[in-house]
Regions:
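ATP-dependent carboxylate/acyl-activation modules
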Residues: 1, 5, 267-317
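N-terminal glycine-/serine-/threonine-rich beta1-alpha1-beta2 phosphate-ribose binding loop
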Residues: 1-90
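Conserved active-site and cofactor/substrate-binding residues in soluble primary-metabolism enzymes
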Residues: 6, 10, 14, 34, ...
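General beta-strand structural signal in soluble alpha/beta enzymes
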Residues: 54-55, 72, 95-97, 120-124, ...
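Rossmann-like NAD(P)H-binding beta-loop-alpha module
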Residues: 67, 114-183, 188-195, 202
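Short glycine-rich anion-binding loops that position phosphate/pyrophosphate groups of nucleotides
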Residues: 75-77, 153, 262
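Rossmann-fold NAD(P)-binding glycine/threonine-rich loop
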Residues: 80-86, 90, 97-137
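Substrate-binding/catalytic subdomain of NAD(P)-dependent oxidoreductase enzymes
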Residues: 173-277
Length: 317
């Protein structure tokens, strides 16, 4: 299987790295070798293994009949949407890690994929390395999902863990997170809750069977959490966590993103540092928990590659 990677930033380069590190195992699981033929990027990468694979025009990929799968790791909605739509219309399967794209245009792209007999998969868009999309789509289809509650942002979870363990204040832990590379220079999407808001919108859209607009979800971040709040919670044997939650009420789902004080017996209370966790409740399954590294180059790239392997394995079914 020849594939293309659109975007050679942190995740895109991670995808290429994972495919090389686990080349033999991936080929065995996919049923054939997976080879990166093109990397789409504005930059050149002289002296690197991909220097002869770089292209600057997405149409080169769309018009090449050898390319069966395209990985999108560009980020943002545009031009990612235009490029991905073109790939699907050209009969290419697409795997993406782009939560902004999936939250804003996921329903439309799924329809385009269906109309052209291909797949659009986005396991890496929600929990980084945590497999949650595939279980919801395949393993839990017999269940009525009544609740999804998750710690879906590693940056804020790291910050709250630091505040809890060291008694540090918000500004101090934010700087520490930025120094360690967990938080961006502009941390707004994390600390104001916009990132987990998009992720819970994606998960709710899957279980509801219709697009849930993240802009309609009430969203609060952690900027107002103080050391005093942390002390109060600890005295009550509780932990403060930024939770993204979706609950079935009647025939619809109600979503909320906000800091919660949760009892130390709750499964999510022990999810600390940059780790993420997703708690599910189904009417047949009961309670289930998914836990793992929620961000980072290789965990996220691993989830993207899992989608690529899945699509390669089932390309003729």
């Amino acid at each position: 299987m020849k594939i293309a990677v659109m975007g050679y930033g942190t995740i895109g380069s991670g995808v290429v790295e994972v495919l090389e590190i686990n080349k033999e195992k991936i080929a065995k699981r996919a049923g054939e070798p997976i080879e990166v033929k093109y990397v789409l990027d504005l930059r050149e990468f002289p002296g690197t293994p991909i220097e002869n694979k770089i292209v600057h025009d997405y149409k080169v990929i769309a018009e090449d009949p050898e390319i069966g799968i395209v990985v999108e790791t560009m980020g943002g909605v545009e031009p990612a949407f235009t490029f991905v739509k073109a790939m699907l219309e050209a009969g290419k399967q697409v795997a993406t890690s782009n939560k902004n794209l999936v939250a804003a245009k996921g329903a439309e792209l799924i329809k385009v994929a269906r109309d052209h007999g291909v797949n659009f998969q986005f396991e890496a868009s929600v929990g980084g390395g945590i497999p949650i999309i595939r279980p919801l789509n395949k393993c839990l289809t017999a269940d009525e999902i009544e609740e999804i509650t998750g710690i879906l942002n590693g940056t804020t979870n790291y910050m709250l863990t630091k505040m809890t363990e060291e008694g540090a204040d918000f500004d101090e832990v934010l700087k520490d997170a930025q120094d360690k590379g967990y938080a961006e220079k502009d941390p707004t999407a994390d600390i104001e809750g916009h990132d987990p808001c998009r992720k819970i919108a994606i998960l709710t859209s899957l279980v509801a069977g219709q697009q849930v607009d993240f802009e309609d979800i009430h969203c609060e971040g952690i900027t107002k959490i103080t050391p005093e709040d942390i002390k109060y919670a600890k005295a009550m044997h509780r932990a403060i966590k930024l939770l993204a939650s979706s609950r079935k009420v009647g025939d619809s789902y109600t979503c909320l993103v906000a800091p919660y004080m949760i009892d130390d017996t709750h499964p999510l209370s022990g999810v600390n540092g940059v780790f993420n966790g997703v708690f599910l409740r189904g009417n047949v399954l009961g309670d289930a928990m998914f836990y793992g590294s929620g961000a980072g180059k290789l965990p996220t790239a691993s989830a993207v590659v899992a989608d690529v392997v899945d699509m390669t394995k089932h390309q003729n079914t």
